[in-house]
C-alpha cells in the first residue's frame, strides 16, 4: 500500500478517538473557566453559610445536602459545587461561601445516566431552561437563577 494511502487510512481510523478526546477537553475547559469547584458534600459540611447552595431553590444547607445526596443515590460519580462566591466580603456578609450551580460527573451506566438526566431536566424546566440531552458528555451542569 502506498505511503499516502496508509497514512490517510490510519488518520481516518484514529479520528473518532481524536474527536472524543477533543470533546472531553473542550468540556473540561468550559467548566474550568467557571472557577474553582469543590466536592459538594465536603463543601456543604464545612460551610457556615446557612444558605450556601442556590438559596432560591434550597431553603437550607440541609435541603441542599439532601439534594446532593439524591444525586449520588442516582449514581453520580462526583458532584461538585460551581460558581462559588468566596471572596472575603461575601464570606463576612453571608457567614460562608455561596454557590448557585452543581456539576455532576456522570457515570457510564445507562440507567444511572438516564436517571440523572431526568432529574436535571426537572430542575431545568423549573427554572425555565431547556433540559440538556445526553450526548455522551462526561458532565451535567445544573444552575439555579
What residue spans do the PLM features occupy?
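Intrinsically disordered, low-complexity regions enriched in Ser/Pro/Gly/Gln/His and often acidic
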Residues: 1, 36, 135-138
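Bacterial N-terminal signal peptides that target proteins for export
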Residues: 1-10
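Sec-dependent N-terminal signal peptides
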Residues: 9-18
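Extended, charge-biased low-complexity segments
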Residues: 26-109
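Short, conserved charged micro-motifs
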Residues: 109-117
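Acidic, proline/glycine-rich low-complexity IDRs
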Residues: 118-145
Amino acid at each position: 500500500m502506498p505511503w499516502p494511502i496508509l497514512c490517510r487510512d490510519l488518520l481516518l481510523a484514529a479520528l473518532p478517538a481524536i474527536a472524543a478526546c477533543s470533546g472531553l477537553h473542550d468540556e473540561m475547559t468550559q467548566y474550568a473557566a467557571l472557577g474553582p469547584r469543590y466536592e459538594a458534600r465536603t463543601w456543604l459540611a464545612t460551610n457556615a453559610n446557612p444558605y450556601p447552595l442556590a438559596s432560591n431553590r434550597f431553603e437550607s444547607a440541609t435541603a441542599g445536602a439532601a439534594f446532593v445526596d439524591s444525586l449520588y443515590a442516582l449514581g453520580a460519580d462526583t458532584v461538585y459545587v460551581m460558581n462559588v462566591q468566596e471572596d472575603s466580603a461575601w464570606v463576612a456578609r453571608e457567614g460562608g461561601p455561596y454557590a448557585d450551580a452543581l456539576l455532576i460527573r456522570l457515570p457510564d451506566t445507562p440507567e444511572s445516566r438516564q436517571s440523572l438526566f431526568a432529574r436535571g431536566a426537572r430542575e431545568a424546566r423549573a427554572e425555565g431552561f431547556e433540559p440538556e440531552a445526553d450526548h455522551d458528555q462526561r458532565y451535567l451542569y445544573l444552575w439555579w437563577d
